[in-house]
Amino acid sequence: MAIHTCFSLIPSSFSSPKLPYPKNTTFQSPIPKLSRPTFMFDRKGSFQNGTAAVPAVGEDFPIDYADWLPKRDPNDRRRAGILLHPTSFPGPYGIGDLGPQAFKFLDWLHLAGCSLWQVLPLVPPGKRGNEDGSPYSGQDANCGNTLLISLEELVDDGLLKMEELPEPLPTDRVNYSTISEIKDPLITKAAKRLLSSEGELKDQLENFRRDPNISSWLEDAAYFAAIDNSVNTISWYDWPEPLKNRHLAALEEVYQSEKDFIDIFIAQQFLFQRQWKKVRDYARSKGISIMGDMPIYVGYHSADVWANKKQFLLNRKGFPLIVSGVPPDAFSETGQLWGSPLYDWKAMEKDGFSWWVRRIQRATDLFDEFRIDHFRGFAGFWAVPSEEKIAILGRWKVGPGKPLFDAILQAVGKINIIAEDLGVITEDVVQLRKSIEAPGMAVLQFAFGSDAENPHLPHNHEQNQVVYTGTHDNDTIRGWWDTLPQEEKSNVLKYLSNIEEEEISRGLIEGAVSSVARIAIIPMQDVLGLGSDSRMNIPATQFGNWSWRIPSSTSFDNLDAEAKKLRDILATYGRL
């Protein structure tokens, strides 16, 4: 509404009459000349003028008072992003990587108006049994997945020759064993050339190796990998006792016999780190924040456990006393038995949670913000005796709670974490999350099976929250819709203002983006409207997961129309 002063109503021809004033009276203009004091808000929201408080009732504000508009807190900015793991990029060598397609994807995100890119854990994926390709069963909590190293980038660095690159492998599914056979020898060759070279790149490698934040985990990881490569056993539990228990003389012998392997391992980690930094720097130049993902637990057969046995609940021989899992939930009637060793939280607290401080520091080196998977485990965790075969036989135990995050805050500073608070969420989990001001999660696919009180429905969302159409553990929107009971379908269509079934992917995306939650995340499969065959993971199943890729026939250059459609939705709901 336009605001006019009273003087705008006086005709220009109007002549003010002369009014008689008493003698000996000092004339005062009815409109005194205004000074322009500097006002500001203090932390409590009151006006301050130097040492003066709010002007007295009836006094004049400065003439620019109408320009004192409220300013939005930058932390309240509404954002949107895409969930897409780098392995899912299209590309010529059977797996997405940190090469040209990563930069094209960031260009696409920028075109779409997105300011977030969420990835799954970047750790080396599991290789044993049903772990094949799983970033949540990683071999090390801090190392990077070297299969993500781009061969084209190695050519640009002069570490590979163009004629050494393999023939294109056009496949829409990642076969991790096949890809390892193709890429590992070439990445090893590049690492050897780097080690034998001189110049700036070699100097960067040496600086990487000497960095205390890197060496705190890198040396243990390298020794572990070297022993694992030379000793043919299922886990470190079966290693010869001097190696199993890290006797100094045994480790010195490993260094002498496996020095080349250790040096190559470290060089490969450097190459991963270097390529990831280039991708992250480019993301920043586009105004895009990268959100990582951190599993709460680590695998038993890992340098994390081998080098830090006192931080885990192991028996005297080094075998887990109890292991991780969750009780029965929407994904499994008997619960999920994850099998990871559990932390000895009492021992960790005694040394200031140093293991977790180092892990969080590493995450901040890789990501702008990150999700912690199974956040509820910090309040209370499900513990299953290691001899049991099903998770339902476990019991709840008290977690570390706020003292852990106090120690992290003191050592690392403020961190931007997202608390994955799905599943069985008790009041202590809610209070812990709120005490550290971490946003929780809502998933629209969980919203329509009950009543209006369902916390996943958009009208029940909170501002400090991240809303997903679905996560990596959910089906795609199209696949979810195809198997949804008719009653739930009716609920969805009614809630989304009677959209057509053909528009269900767009409808649910709009449902997420229109939420009051500050952050909305959409899996790339949903942007493309894909079905169940493009699902990333089916919880509690053993095979066929983590392999989906954007079809090799598709390029981000050909997805401008999808980007513009998404941008229109984001603009409508204030997320640009």
UniProtKB/Swiss-Prot annotation:
One Pfam family here: Glyco_hydro_77
Enzyme Commission code(s) on record: 2.4.1.25
GO molecular function: 4-alpha-glucanotransferase activity
UniProt-annotated location(s): Plastid, Chloroplast; Plastid, Amyloplast
Top-level enzyme category: transferase
GO cellular component assignments: amyloplast; chloroplast
Superkingdom as given in the UniProt entry: Eukaryota
Keywords: Amyloplast, Carbohydrate metabolism, Chloroplast, Glycosyltransferase, Plastid, Transferase, Transit peptide
Catalytic activity line of the entry: Transfers a segment of a (1->4)-alpha-D-glucan to a new position in an acceptor, which may be glucose or a (1->4)-alpha-D-glucan
Name of this protein: 4-alpha-glucanotransferase, chloroplastic/amyloplastic
